[in-house]
Design a protein with these regions (language model features):
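Solvent-exposed, conformationally flexible loop/turn segments
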Residues: 39-52
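Hydrophobic h-region of N-terminal signal peptides that target proteins for export
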Residues: 13-20
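Bacterial N-terminal signal peptides that target proteins for export
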Residues: 1-8
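Surface-exposed repetitive/solenoidal architectures
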Residues: 23-35, 49, 58-59, 64-67, ...
Length: 472
């Protein structure tokens, strides 16, 4: 059936006779359908992993590539992962070693229609699938939705290849609407319609009347996804409308706790948000005084991604029920995103209100972005109203609340040497009441920083250019 199957089998046998003497093995690739195409094999030191950069990504018309497998059936337990479960700054914890010359088989996925709630729920059975929504669906009859795709605690520093239980497929909403998502109790601390997405895509989807109302610790929650991760340039949310969202959460601040609440995705590590619209409101009450970080924004919380041509209209209300420790707690809040790298041609409307108990919290609030990590914010505008009451340090910027020095050094390590805010506008004037240390900058909370030095040899410089400010 497969034109190159016999050839690969014969070649594999001949390679095996010499591999032991040479201490190398070869990985061959079978495209797993009737074709004359061929992919070059990869040579690997025997007993070592196949590096991530050696993984081929073939293309087949009408199908989506779904990974490499050790047998042509391409069952989940047969998946072969390249690289290792680590990033450039963490030690490897897991890998698949090539012990002998072998053949890997391509998995191909074709579009599958989704017409019922039951079919939507079943996509968790094939996380590489390509799904097309063909009807509007109402989820309000499900008291507590279980997210599709799971995040594991050791995912954070791993390539998306190793996010073994995340959604890695395509979900095309086809312009249809999913209404009435309900999350009333967390089954995982990364929650939404999807719990975790890794190198997957969500397109052309509308969501309305989502209700995320619960009490929990350490949540990363949003209507669409708890966490999105990409390494291949293909993780994306495009042309989606997530509107009428209500997020009401009471959470407790333990030592070193991270929380994230947004109208689209709790965190996004790489990938693209493009041509989307979000609206709604959130009410967050934070108990406990253990330190940590809080992220709140219309689109994304902890974010290192590209956001383009997105609009938001979100009311964000955050209350600290107890005083926070001095210098032990930070909150990053943005009308568009809590934190960001690259933002282009976006618009934010709405309101941000923060109230406390006169503690030592540090607040960084931006009309667009609470904390700009590294990159470029351009061509964007905010009219978000900001009000802060009874807190410690509160730094507000019309466009960005802060330029984060620590992440600026990290950006330099990635080769980004200039962080820029250009061609942006802010209309409004923040209100401070009983704030012990208020700071306001028309474009950035503390203005344009001095350049940063970097231990990697490349520093970070900052530039604010061609921005405009009006009080009303």
């Amino acid at each position: 059936m497969y034109s190159n199957r016999l050839f690969l089998s014969i070649l594999l046998c001949s390679v095996a006779l010499t591999a032991a003497a040479q201490h190398t093995s070869r990985v061959f690739f079978d495209l797993n359908y009737d074709t004359d195409q061929a992919l070059a094999p990869v040579t690997v030191t025997t007993g070592c992993m196949a590096p991530a950069e050696a993984k081929p990504y073939p293309v087949r018309e009408g199908y989506r590539f779904g990974g490499w497998y050790t047998a042509p059936e391409c069952r989940p337990e047969q998946e072969w992962r390249f690289g290792c479960n680590a990033s450039f700054y963490t030690q490897p914890t897991d890998s698949m070693c090539v012990e002998r010359s072998m053949i890997l088989y391509a998995k191909w996925v074709s579009p599958k229609p989704i017409r019922t709630v039951e079919e939507l729920d079943a996509i968790r059975e094939d996380l590489y699938g390509w799904y097309v929504l063909e009807n509007d669906l109402d989820l309000s009859g499900i008291a507590n939705w279980t997210p599709v795709g799971e995040y594991e605690g050791d995912y954070e520093f791993a390539p998306a290849e190793w996010w073994r239980h995340a959604f890695k497929g395509v979900f095309d909403g086809g312009g249809h609407t999913i209404r009435g998502l309900r999350i009333t109790e967390l089954t995982t601390d990364k929650s939404g319609l999807f719990g975790a997405i890794a190198d997957g895509e969500v397109l052309n989807l509308n969501m309305e009347d989502s209700r995320l109302v619960f009490t929990a610790e350490r949540p990363y929650v949003a209507p669409l996804a708890g966490i999105i991760k990409q390494d291949l340039g293909q993780a994306a949310v495009r042309n989606c409308r997530i509107t009428g969202t209500l997020i009401q959460v009471r959470t407790t601040n333990r030592e070193g706790t991270f929380h994230s609440f947004t109208g689209l995705c709790g965190g996004i590590w790489g990938g693209t948000l493009e041509d989307n619209t979000v609206s709604g409101r959130m009410e967050i009450e934070l108990a406990g005084s253990g330190g940590g970080e809080l992220y709140a924004g219309a689109y994304a919380g902890e974010a290192y991604n590209d956001t383009r041509r997105c609009t938001s209209d979100f009311d964000i209300d955050i209350r600290f029920a107890v005083p926070q420790p001095a210098d032990g707690f930070k909150a990053f809040i943005g009308g568009l995103q809590a934190s960001a790298t690259n933002v282009e041609d976006c618009t934010a409307r709405g309101r941000i209100r923060v109230s406390g108990e006169s503690g030592g919290e540090q607040l960084f609030i931006g009309g667009l972005v609470g904390s700009e990590r590294y990159g470029k914010v351009s061509g964007s505008a905010s009219t978000v109203k900001v009000e802060v009451r009874n807190t410690g340090f509160a730094q507000v910027g019309g466009i960005v609340g802060e330029f984060n020095a620590g992440y600026g050094v990290m950006g330099a390590a990635f080769g980004v040497t200039t962080t820029t805010v250009e061609g942006c506008s802010y209309t409004g004037k923040p209100v401070f009441r009983k704030v012990s240390r208020p700071v306001f900058g028309q474009f950035a909370g503390a203005g344009e920083p001095e350049p940063l030095a970097s231990p990697w040899g490349m520093g970070m410089s900052y530039k604010i250019d061609r921005c405009t400010y009006k009080t009303k």
